[in-house]
Amino acid sequence: MCLFTFLATGIFKFENYPKTMQLTSPYNRPAKLTVFIMAFAGSLCLAQSPSDFSVKTDKLLYQSTMDSAASVKDWVMEGPGHLKFADGWMEMRSPNEEMHHVYWCPETFPSDFMAQWEMQNQHLEAGLCIVFFAATGLESEDVMDSSLPKRDGVFSQYNNEALKNYHISYYANTPKLPARAVARLRKNPGKNIVYEGPPGINVESDRAHKVTLIKNKAHIRLFIDDRLIIDWIDDGKVNGGPLDAGKIALRQMQWTHFRYRNFKVWSLTSDN
């Protein structure tokens, strides 16, 4: 993290996290001012390469170019998500904005990993993007285990019923809450907000962005390009200890139309 982001993040935490890791009122004026400070500070930072994320990667566990149906042939769509492949990208949306949808990577990843993907907004009017990770059944079953309840994109099926996971909303621009001022990390089941940081992908941005998600033991971070928006250590006070190995999924709400490419996941070295 660069100096400007470090200082701004410190201000944000001081104002909003004195006793808990949650904002009591993220939409008040001081919070909005702090978010602006953090966004400005992030823009001053020097660009970072993957080696600059203060973590050592080991093996490349999985990669998909996401540029053809063959490149995602083992992925599983839940809900009415529609895919289109063009110009080296995978577009994902719900026809007629029918319903939310979740797209599961087929691999189960270890507790400690770094994942990266690129994405670009194709519909600036509205949308919401989430990443689920460390996802399993409540008894650590594979999320695709046939004994688990069927899922079709309804949110409660992922955060309140039969699964445990973390999820981060890193682009949030819904009709009821346009240009939401924070990114959120929740620990499930229970939709427990455990951390709120500065906004993720700018709602007015139509350029491509690189998302980097790092889970190093109990430490969870998420970057949009070189900008740190989530930085939290799971102390086990919510839903028990840190979650372990599990699957990753990309979720979009019904209004969302993004395109994706170059999804990669690395393991981390033991000396992180």
Task: Give, region by region, the residue ranges found by the protein language model.
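Short carbohydrate-recognition loop motifs
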Residues: 82-99
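Flexible glycan-contacting loops in extracellular carbohydrate-active proteins
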Residues: 233-261
